[in-house]
Swiss-Prot record:
Disulfide bonds: none annotated. Keywords: Cell inner membrane, Cell membrane, Ion channel, Ion transport, Membrane, Metal-binding, Sodium, Transmembrane, Transmembrane helix, Transport. It is found in: Cell inner membrane. It comes from Rhodopseudomonas palustris (strain BisB5). GO terms for cellular component: plasma membrane. This is Fluoride-specific ion channel FluC. NCBIfam families: crcB, PRK14195.1, PRK14198.1. Fluoride-specific ion channel. Important for reducing fluoride concentration in the cell, thus reducing its toxicity.
Amino acid sequence: MTYLLVFLGGGLGAMFRHFINTVSGRMLGTAFPYHTFFINVSGSLVMGLIAGYFAFKGGSSQHVRLFLMTGILGGYTTFSAFSLDAALLYERGAVGLAALYVLGSVALAIAGLFAGLALIRAIT
């Protein structure tokens, strides 16, 4: 049942993401990645709202959390999970580890992308 909830939520999140990509491209153009910027910021905002609500106003079932946070937000943007992880490290007092996580994730993700591009260029 949990996999089905994540699957269904992920599909909805991906549809929302595609909608934002399409609309922002038409409205703002494609010279700057407004769509990704908006998705990352809005997804992180919603993750904060949901996580904060569950933490401060009372929990909810694991099924609801999986559907909303892992499913919908995971399909919409994984940046929200990244932001939550960084915030949790910071709030636990692991400021240095949070900074390392943020800088390392961004730098290694970009390096990984360039490595993938270089590899595919080399073999094609």
